[in-house]
Swiss-Prot record:
Protein's UniProt keywords contain Iron-sulfur: yes
Cofactor note: Binds 2 [4Fe-4S] clusters per subunit. One cluster is coordinated with 3 cysteines and an exchangeable S-adenosyl-L-methionine.
Name assigned to this protein: Lipoyl synthase, mitochondrial
GO terms of biological process kind: lipoate biosynthetic process
EC nos: 2.8.1.8
Catalytic activity reported: [[Fe-S] cluster scaffold protein carrying a second [4Fe-4S](2+) cluster] + N(6)-octanoyl-L-lysyl-[protein] + 2 oxidized [2Fe-2S]-[ferredoxin] + 2 S-adenosyl-L-methionine + 4 H(+) = [[Fe-S] cluster scaffold protein] + N(6)-[(R)-dihydrolipoyl]-L-lysyl-[protein] + 4 Fe(3+) + 2 hydrogen sulfide + 2 5'-deoxyadenosine + 2 L-methionine + 2 reduced [2Fe-2S]-[ferredoxin]
Transit peptide (residue range): 1-31
Length: 414
């Protein structure tokens, strides 16, 4: 009992302190009532006004709501429409001015059912695509269309690691990538026949660690696809096989419909843009060899703009490509994948892309796709079917067949 009494007294002794705290708390809460207490009134008179924010200052300095709704949709002139905007980025005291991505280069985030289905199939068969590895901005367009037969998939063969390190490309690099998957040709053909695509693009990483550069693996994949889906159109976007033209001929005779090899940029900028093992003249020889090996093939190449090239350099590149009998050329805007890669020298406007498209057609190219978001395989099926195959078949009265009988690797190498 003595212990409990002393404990009770200690609780009573602390009550005056707790009452003071409670009274103070109540007086603070009464600040919001219609009749504030004297202490609350004195506190409110000494409180300073909140500082105006930068956002509010900018908002008040801009047009009024009446101005916003009253001007209508006045069209912008080209200089206003293509004006680049900048922003200050970084911590206080170390901010840097960065050029914002132009509006004509912005694309939607992919989320369609077709996109999810293709991605699931690819992971299940352990296949890679350049669409994902190279962070292509058009993946929602190429994979997300409602019409499967018009969709385009770009399968990347021989793994996801390249032996070269071009300064514009985000694909992983290594001197010793993983060995080839012997089941990849069969898996690729199975996936493509399952999807019901009308057009497929096969590309690959460079494999300088292999004696043939992976050419036989490439050719075998084409043959498997043609066996499972004879009506599908196949485009092969290959490397230069270190200049081994016999390997180029092997792939060209494997049964494909389009042989593509990208020169990437003009000759003068090639040493700064591409890996040291690649050069412009070697790429020209690859395209010539493919055409000579199978004259019925469509040959195709692509150039990136915005790297610092001049008009004269572009003219020279196009002349050399036409001299090599290249049929199709595409122009697209270079977009820096990460801060480790080459910076963008210039954002080329859509009007300039249209100008170069007209120039290429005037020079005799069979077809030219040109635009900020155009990539070498962007909507390749649509462009090829509508602008190349149909044109050729109409000229020949519908009797021409593009492509050749698939053969074995042994037949090709004999």
């Amino acid at each position: 009992m003595a212990v409990s009494t002393s404990h009770f007294r200690s609780l009573c002794a602390s009550r005056p302190l707790s009452r003071t705290a409670i009274v103070g708390h109540i007086s603070c809460r009464s600040y919001a009532t219609t009749e504030p207490s004297p202490s609350a009134t004195s506190t409110s008179t000494t409180t300073t006004a909140r500082r105006r924010t930068t956002f509010k200052d900018k908002l008040n300095a801009g047009p009024s709501f009446a101005d916003f709704v009253g001007n209508g949709n006045t069209p912008l002139d080209p200089s206003e429409a293509y004006a680049l905007k900048t922003a200050l980025v970084g911590p206080a005291g170390r901010k840097k001015e960065m050029t914002r991505l132009p509006s004509w280069l912005k694309t939607p985030i992919p989320d369609s059912k077709n996109y999810q289905r293709l991605k699931k199939d690819l992971r299940g068969l352990n296949l890679h695509t350049v669409c994902e590895e190279a962070r292509c901005p058009n993946i929602s367009d190429c994979w997300g269309g409602s019409d499967k037969s018009a969709a385009t998939a770009t399968i990347m063969l021989m793994g996801d690691t390249c032996t070269r390190g071009c300064r514009f490309c985000s694909v992983k690099t290594s001197r010793t990538p993983a060995p080839l998957d012997p089941h990849e040709p069969e898996n690729t053909a199975e996936a493509i026949s399952r999807w019901g695509l009308g057009y497929v693009v096969l590309t690959s990483v460079d494999r300088d660690d292999l004696a043939d550069g992976g050419a036989r693996h490439f050719a075998e994949t084409v043959m498997k696809i043609k066996q499972k889906a004879p009506s599908i159109l196949v485009e092969c976007l290959t490397g230069d096989y270190a200049g081994d033209l016999e390997m180029v001929k092997l792939v060209a005779r494997s049964g494909l419909d389009v042989y593509a090899h990208n020169v990437e940029t003009v000759e003068a900028l090639t040493p700064q843009v591409r890996d040291r093992r690649a050069n412009f003249q070697q790429s020209i020889r690859v395209l010539e060899a493919a055409k000579n090996a199978q004259p019925s093939l469509i040959t195709k190449t692509s150039l990136m703009l915005g790297l610092g090239e001049t008009d004269d350099q572009l003219w020279d590149a196009l002349r050399q490509l036409r001299a090599a009998n290249v049929d199709v050329v595409t122009f697209g805007q270079y977009m820096r994948p990460t801060k480790r890669h080459m910076a963008v020298h210039e954002y080329v406007t859509p009007d300039r892309f249209e100008l170069w498209r007209q120039r290429a057609l005037d020079m005799g190219f069979l077809y030219c796709a040109s635009g900020p978001l155009v990539r070498s395989s962007y909507k390749a099926g649509e462009a090829f079917i509508e602008n190349v195959l149909k044109k050729r078949r109409a000229t020949s009265g519908g009797t021409e067949t593009v492509g050749v009988r698939p053969v074995t690797v042994d037949e090709v190498t004999r």
